[in-house]
């Protein structure tokens, strides 16, 4: 799977029986999990995690990574960047492949308690850890990219990090492992990165420094390349009722050139 141009992303296929047992374990402990999420997010003035699994409206589907319905999900960015001077962009380095399964217990029970009872398989959070390993042939490092179970498990850890960050920072959002924070000064922006890095290290995660940047505001909400494609599309649509092959080919070539430059 190619998430970005020339950047491969390996999708994982779980051990079938192991994945079934993990799903059952999550189902059996769903009340504790939802209560955990409620506790971790109750103090948020807005939903920090913008992309997460949630029950779908008006459908029998159990889950979907749906975050496009602004009527229900809201769009907090216009409110939180007003008056701010800087935008911080940070990313977790190899987030899913780097997650240590024991860190799930650290988040659910607290690091000290989880380490004291690491071998007690009667504890619900240790069972989640155990079956997470089992779905990946007993490995303790890494969540598979693809299964919804991985999104639930990663949110357990990332929501614990959010809980600590929101005590100090109110104007930031997170798209899975991608953070955007708006600040009043460059010093505050740099401090956010320091604090984020410290919180990530508590769960053996690292920032991707190649994607870390501090930008001075204001900035365009929509990237320039998107505007160019929209303008090109508008020109095609207004020309006539149909588009011939040469125009389509020229449009595709134009788009490919933009991709190669981005």
What are these regions (language model features)?
Residues 92-96, 183-185, 214, 218:
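Short, flexible loop/turn elements at secondary-structure junctions
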Residues 116-117, 152-177, 181-184, 189:
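Active-site palm subdomain of RNA-directed nucleic acid polymerases
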Residues 18, 96, 150-157:
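Hydrophobic (often cysteine-bearing) scaffold residues that line and stabilize catalytic clefts
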Residues 39-43, 116-122, 172-175, 183, ...:
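Short, glycine/acidic-rich hinge or "gate" loops at secondary-structure transitions
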Residues 190-262:
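C-terminal polymerase-core module
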Residues 81-84, 148, 167, 175-176, ...:
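Short, well-ordered loop/turn elements at secondary-structure boundaries
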Residues 1-145:
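Conserved two-metal-ion catalytic palm core of "right-hand" nucleic acid polymerases
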Residues 103, 108, 180-199:
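Catalytic palm subdomain of template-directed nucleic-acid polymerases
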């Amino acid at each position: 799977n190619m998430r970005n141009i020339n950047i491969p992303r390996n999708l994982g296929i779980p051990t079938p029986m192991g994945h079934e047992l993990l799903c059952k374990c999550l189902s059996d402990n769903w009340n504790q999990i939802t209560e955990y999420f409620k506790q971790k997010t109750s103090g948020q003035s807005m939903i920090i995690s913008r992309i997460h699994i949630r029950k779908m409206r008006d459908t029998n589907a159990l889950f979907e990574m749906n975050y496009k319905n602004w009527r229900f999900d809201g769009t907090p960015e216009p409110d939180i960047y007003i008056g701010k001077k800087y935008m911080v962009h940070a990313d977790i380095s190899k987030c899913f492949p780097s997650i240590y399964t024991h860190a799930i217990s650290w988040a659910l029970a607290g690091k000290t308690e989880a380490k004291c009872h690491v071998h007690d398989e009667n504890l619900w959070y240790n069972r989640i850890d155990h079956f997470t390993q089992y779905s990946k042939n007993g490995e303790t490092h890494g969540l598979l990219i693809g299964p919804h179970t991985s999104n639930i498990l990663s949110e357990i850890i990332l929501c614990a990090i959010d809980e600590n960050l929101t005590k100090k920072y109110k104007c930031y959002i997170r798209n899975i492992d991608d953070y955007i924070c708006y600040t009043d000064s460059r010093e505050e922006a740099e401090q956010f990165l320091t604090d984020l890095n410290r919180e990530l290290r508590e769960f053996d995660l690292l920032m991707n420094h190649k994607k870390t940047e501090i930008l001075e505001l204001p900035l365009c909400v929509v990237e320039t390349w998107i505007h160019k494609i929209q303008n090109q599309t508008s020109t095609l649509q207004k020309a006539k009722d149909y588009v011939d092959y040469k125009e389509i080919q020229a449009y595709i070539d134009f788009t490919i050139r933009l991709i190669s430059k981005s």
